């Protein structure tokens, strides 16, 4: 169930991000922000992104994409408790890594989810969010430090998984605390014929984009159990960080390409990270 719901959530994220990039926005209209055409299963589809809300009768039947995210998170947490927390003494604790009781290991795991979310949410709500470069440097540095710290507390496999748990929790938090509430406030304003606060749409879109960039790394971590030579590597935290850079830059490259912006310099960052990754894996063997 967790994998199925995750597929649906990721599919939604990719679809709407793709549509936003592909819509023709050079339209002179007071109501239409962008439009485009698609073809699927033998039919043409017209897509229109509106500047203002649709008629009230349409608002009452809006399709809001939220349950994919909610169910992915709920099923993931259930699996976390049933498989890992219940068997924490075996799956989470390694006395060679750190002398810690299973109870403390579980508490640290739970606290890490809340702590990372609070820090990330604070950064998003601060003026720092206006400086993309600085925001990226700080969040990636935080990810690197978190990955390193977790490998010094938990078993290698659970440390890897914990990074995915943290990112997945952030993605859910974005949907549950920002995206959906903002959308509901926009709908309420529309139903009352009040002016829509554009900052609500911008904040929701911003968090949605963050989720989009996190997706590849979370999916990689979900599958990392199949790559023991990476998970149990001496420098697994650095390997994970290299993958984070490669996957994020790849996502950014294709997002720009969807808007017909070709920036090959982004690929240079990916290539450097890939060379660094290969060096770690093949020179410093487990």
Locations of regions flagged by a protein language model:
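Polytopic transmembrane helical bundles with strong interfacial aromatic enrichment
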Residues: 1-286
């Amino acid at each position: 169930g967790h994998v199925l719901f995750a597929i649906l959530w990721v599919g939604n994220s990719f679809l709407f991000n793709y549509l936003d990039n592909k819509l023709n926005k050079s339209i002179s209209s007071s109501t239409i922000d962008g439009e485009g055409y698609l073809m699927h299963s033998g039919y043409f589809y017209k897509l229109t992104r509106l500047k203002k809300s649709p008629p009230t009768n349409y608002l009452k039947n809006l399709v809001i994409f939220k349950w994919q995210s909610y169910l992915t998170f709920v099923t993931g947490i259930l699996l976390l408790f049933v498989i890992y927390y219940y068997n924490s003494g075996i799956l989470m604790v390694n006395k060679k890594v750190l002398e810690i009781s299973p109870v403390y290991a579980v508490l640290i795991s739970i606290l890490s989810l809340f702590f990372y979310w609070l820090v990330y949410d604070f950064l998003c709500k601060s003026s720092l969010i206006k400086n993309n470069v600085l925001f990226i440097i700080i969040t990636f540095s935080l990810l690197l430090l978190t990955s390193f710290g977790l490998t010094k507390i938990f078993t290698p496999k659970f440390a890897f998984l914990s990074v995915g748990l943290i990112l997945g929790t952030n993605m859910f938090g974005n949907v549950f605390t920002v995206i959906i509430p903002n959308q509901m406030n926009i709908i309420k304003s529309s139903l009352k014929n009040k002016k829509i606060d554009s900052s609500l749409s911008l904040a929701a879109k911003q968090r949605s984009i963050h989720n989009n960039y996190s997706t590849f790394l979370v999916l990689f971590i979900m599958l990392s159990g199949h790559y023991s030579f990476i998970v149990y590597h001496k420098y697994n935290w650095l390997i994970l960080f290299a993958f984070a850079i490669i996957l994020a830059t790849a996502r950014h490259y294709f997002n720009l390409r969807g808007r017909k912006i070709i920036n090959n310099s982004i690929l240079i960052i990916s290539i450097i990270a890939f060379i660094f990754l290969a060096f770690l894996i093949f020179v410093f063997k487990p």
